[in-house]
């Protein structure tokens, strides 16, 4: 009976891992599209790609919760944290022959998640650099006047930069 239950759980976890791998692959494609849209300044596409990535992330989170609940069924009253290592040990104890397939899927998922993190870091680096460049440009355009300003009482005053309007797309 325990072997049958282990096989059933392994099949469920396997299906979730396959779905998660597919979702992370889609997230990576969306991240690449976001990066390309940012680089080419296609702002109208960025918003749609970001909302697509958010929808995929919500779907991934839902699958992750389902997987967590399945893993928790292995030891519902145990004190140890629920993780894949304990699930793999459970499959080995039950002598289930799908252990290697589940481990391979889990490794593939971890690899895809690492690739997604790399894509995210590339976007973050680009945005940080662009933000710094824009700040430096605005600072250079609104540099303070050379002389000093004083109040009517003779106290030095630091003038706040006025409004700046761009009539060109940067």
From Swiss-Prot:
Could you tell me the superkingdom of the organism this chain comes from?
A: Bacteria
Official protein name in the record: Uncharacterized protein TP_0661
Q: Which species does this protein come from?
A: Treponema pallidum (strain Nichols)
